[in-house]
Amino acid sequence: MSLPKPNSFRAGPDERGHFGTFGGRFVAETLMPLILDLEKAYAAAKADPSFQKEMNGYLKDYVGRPSPLYFAERLTEHLGGAKIYLKREELNHTGSHKVNNVLGQIMVARRMGKKRIIAETGAGQHGVATATLCARFGLECIVYMGAVDVARQEPNVIRMEMLGAKVVPVQSGTRTLKDAMNDALRDWVTNVATTFYCIGTVAGPHPYPAMVRDFQSVIGHETREQMMAAEGRLPDSLVACIGGGSNAMGLFHPFLDEPAVEIFGVEAAGHGLTNLHAASLAGGRPGVLHGNRTYLLMNEDGQIQDAHSISAGLDYPGIGPEHAWLHETGRVTYLSATDEEALAAFQLLSRLEGIIPALESAHAIAKLSQLAPKRPRDHLMVVNLSGRGDKDVPQVGDILRGRKS
């Protein structure tokens, strides 16, 4: 009797944090002891049944999980073809998938005795989730946010401050997510002993990409159970937007070893792939940023290029290393949607289903017009609705009013 083949798509990373040639731990010597401590603390937490039991309790009673899997009937009729389900992460407490990961990291931070929590944020959803959990557990919270994002995501800035967080506008570089992460890393190096850095996506040095993925995988595990209950079988395809890629990895990972399930990630094409965009797989090449090797937007000299997206949460010049590996292996197909396509999808879902999506999630919705009509009516397609669009209503309103005037 032959042994089963190893689980090739879900076994990573290796002990040094690599997914193929991607990932790793590229950090200052000052941080290495803390990174190793974090790796040990996370491994101990995973092995402790009481940790998972406590986390499951908070996911149920505080976050509001499981999030529904909703059949989008009118959207399905409008597009024709595939039967579209929405995994409704926007109904979580704080309004997005971000809280799944933050809860897990804050629980690890408490096990490590850390009282000061720092975070970076783009759209503000990770910042709001971090501020929320810090308020719940009585921890100091500092959130770094690019000054451009502070201006375009004002509702979330106000929420963070109401929750007791200190929001630090970052004025360097392009004043967006990349620069917020740079300043958060500088803070961490300076305050290693007291501070826990709560990274919001599947990027950064090992063990962050794997840890964030694990905490977000509740999305995919629930989707499997819910689809079996609703349809008696697994979905035929999955679709999710990608900045760093945590909502996508959370949905994708539990399905990676199901070869019959097609998987699509949608990057932000901005003004188009030849101009300002944030599609690092479509328009970038491998390099090192923020502690890991992945695909990055770089110029000929290897300098990081400016990213652009209408969505603050996708406005990042890189992608999580596991996504880079899945791209190179061909297991996941990566597409891209422009600002205009996302804006149209934002309005379409609002009018057809009465659900206002985050601009990030609207990038995934935008690709349905390309994917759904080509598939038969019994094809089951799940789209991760990663966040709600309340935060984007002022920005979208300004854009639409400007076009009417």
UniProtKB/Swiss-Prot annotation:
GO terms for cellular component: cytoplasm. Its cofactor is pyridoxal 5'-phosphate. It catalyses: (1S,2R)-1-C-(indol-3-yl)glycerol 3-phosphate + L-serine = D-glyceraldehyde 3-phosphate + L-tryptophan + H2O. Gene3D superfamilies: 3.40.50.1100. Disulfide bonds: none annotated. Its EC number is 4.2.1.20. InterPro entries: Trp_synth_b_CS, Trp_synth_beta, Trp_synth_beta/beta-like, TrpB-like_PALP, TrpB-like_PALP_sf. One of its GO terms (molecular function) is tryptophan synthase activity. The beta subunit is responsible for the synthesis of L-tryptophan from indole and L-serine. Belongs to the TrpB family. This is Tryptophan synthase beta chain. The gene is trpB.
